[in-house]
């Protein structure tokens, strides 16, 4: 029997929708234009000032947008911008289409949010999967696009073609914690209870939490039903699933905790989705 699900009020969730900020690439271009404009004006009005003097005067104003920007903000504002500025060998996209009821989504895989790739592949063994991975030897954070800005065409298509999405993420903390959010509040609560019963440090987030993932702009919430579960795992917890937590070694050093955890998630999906 299909279970009754409780939706989040999407209008209320929209209040916390992330305002799209200019990317750092865009800010840099604007700064160059501002530099040219200021240089010409100063040079005309005060021709006796040297070029070095002009640069000293205007440099603080050019750097101001970068100091004001959130340190964790994306470098790029869209996938198209990322693709135009990054080497194609530095990222990969993997997809598999199966039952349209559930899509396993991991848009920060590889070295971006380490461990989410391996978890997504295992959980989606017999399910639909979308996976974006950063493959740089270092600096994969440059490939991070927030869920509200991730607009890679295949990802958007697959999300819309599935009725529910389970989105895997990682956040930086040495503590071992799992934060459960998403718009599918009933199933999110059920999953939290299941994880707790199996001994995992899970907590259900309120819709106002920054990791709740309930914004209508969030890619995971653009499925045919608008229902999602977002699983945010701390660095400490993700590290506990592998014997060696490096990009090249994670796939071959998944430990018993990894397989117990992914089986718990997989069994939950089988029992609660049709």
Placement of each model-derived feature along the sequence:
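Bacterial N-terminal signal peptides
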Residues: 56-65
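Polybasic, lysine-rich low-complexity intrinsically disordered segments
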Residues: 11, 20-21
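N-terminal targeting leaders characterized by basic, low-complexity, disordered sequences
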Residues: 1-7
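Positively charged N-terminal leader segments that act as targeting/secretion signals
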Residues: 21-26, 53
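N-terminal catalytic or cofactor-binding beta/alpha core of small enzyme domains
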Residues: 69-274
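Bacterial N-terminal signal peptides that target proteins for export
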Residues: 46-54
């Amino acid at each position: 029997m299909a279970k009754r699900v409780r939706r989040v009020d999407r209008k209320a969730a929209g209040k916390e929708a992330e305002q799209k900020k200019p990317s750092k690439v865009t800010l840099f271009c604007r700064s160059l234009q501002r530099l040219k404009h200021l240089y010409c004006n100063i040079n005309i009005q005060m021709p006796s000032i040297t070029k070095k003097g002009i640069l000293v005067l205007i440099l603080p104003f050019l750097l101001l947008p970068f100091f004001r920007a959130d340190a964790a903000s994306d470098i790029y504002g869209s996938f198209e911008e990322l693709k135009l500025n990054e080497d194609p060998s530095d990222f990969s996209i993997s997809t598999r289409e199966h039952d349209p009821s559930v899509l396993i989504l991991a848009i920060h895989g590889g070295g971006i949010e380490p461990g989410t790739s391996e978890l997504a592949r295992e959980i989606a063994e017999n399910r639909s999967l979308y996976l974006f991975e950063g493959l740089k030897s270092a600096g994969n954070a440059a490939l991070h696009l927030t869920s509200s800005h991730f607009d890679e065409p295949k990802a958007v298509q697959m999300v819309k073609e599935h009725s529910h999405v389970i989105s895997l993420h990682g956040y930086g903390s040495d503590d071992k914690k799992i934060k459960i959010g998403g718009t599918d509040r009933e199933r999110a609560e059920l999953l939290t209870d299941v994880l707790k019963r199996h001994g995992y440090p899970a907590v259900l987030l309120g819709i106002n939490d920054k990791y709740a993932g309930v914004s209508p702009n969030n890619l995971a919430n653009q499925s045919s039903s608008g229902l999602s579960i977002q699983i945010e795992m701390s660095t400490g917890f993700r590290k506990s699933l592998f014997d060696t937590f490096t990009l090249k070694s994670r796939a071959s050093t998944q430990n018993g905790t990894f397989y117990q955890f992914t089986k718990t998630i997989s069994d939950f999906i089988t029992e609660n989705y049709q």
